[in-house]
Amino acid sequence: MSDVTAIKQLVEKQKQLKSEIAKIIIGQEQIVDEIILSIFSGGHALLIGVPGLAKTLMVNTISQALGLDFKRIQFTPDLMPSDILGSEVLDENRNFKFIKGPVFANIILADEINRTPPKTQSALLESMQEKAVTVAGVRYKLELPFFVLATQNPIEQEGTYPLPEAQLDRFMFAVKLNYPSFSEEVQVVKQTTTDTEVTVNPLFNAQEIIDYQHLIRRIPVVDNVIEYAVSLVNKTRPKTEMATDFINNYLDWGAGPRASQNLILAAKTHAAFHGKFSPDIEDVKAVANGILRHRIIKNYKAEAERITEDDIIKTIL
């Protein structure tokens, strides 16, 4: 199949995927879009939202519709790296046998990742970067495609271990989850308080998703779009030649080169989903918020004046 035909097919399948997910998840289109963009771009996503907004249900539904294996890990202060990666046990012949942990799935929901100490966080983050884990000196490759969706509760900060900036940078998207609108919540209550069973049909399989990820990487990008993405990222860096006074006043730290790479990858996926054979500047703008918001560090002045990351990104766009 030619790449042109494959992109046309992807447009149709992506529309079907969204309508399949909408059978169970009401509203939240932007969030679902960003998660799907992240999966097809080969990245990971961080979901920031208060409890009770159907994060687990959303990820479970998306994994069913994609035909992928799904595991949920609840992060707690006493969780150990072996609880995620797996461990070696003695079998009946007194030989060591490796028992795989929950990380050996296609889609991992790392629930409340900031509740566990850095030692355990880094075990998951290594697997995100390397797509492999090392246990007792032996390296095990993970099943592909591999996608981590980590959640964080922005309200409770007691007893949490905030993710360091270097680890946050490994997430392609930071997705902000808001409360549903009044009409959406009415629909949610109607749907969840009856005895009807809704089934989600798988539309893809693991190999198809890997093929689409390769297809997206093959999409060509013109130089001016790459230069625009890199200039956007450069504008977030205070005290550099491209930084405006607004950035110098309100930011301590800007985004690194990984942000530029992710902007282009996500823009390619966004373009493919809309039937375009090459991304333009509008595609970069469409994905900029989700890719930059967790990579810029505000200073005390911005906190005091209640300026959000999205406000800052709006000024550079």
Briefly describe each language-model feature range.
Residues 39-76:
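Walker A/P-loop
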Residues 68, 161-178, 196-199:
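A short helix-turn-beta junction within AAA+ P-loop NTPase domains corresponding to the substrate/partner-engaging
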Residues 7-11, 24, 174-246, 273-277, ...:
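Conserved C-terminal "switch" segment of AAA+ ATPases
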Residues 8-53:
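Pre-Walker A (pre-P-loop) alpha-helix and adjacent loop at the N terminus of AAA/AAA+ ATPase modules
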Residues 97-106, 135-152, 163-172:
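AAA+/SF3 P-loop NTPase mechanochemical coupling elements
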Residues 82, 104-129, 143, 158-167, ...:
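Conserved AAA+/SF3 P-loop NTPase catalytic/coupling segment centered on the Walker-B
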Residues 1, 239-317:
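C-terminal engagement/docking regions of AAA+ P-loop ATPases
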Residues 34-37, 88-109:
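Conserved alpha-helical scaffold flanking the Walker A/P-loop in AAA+ ATPase domains
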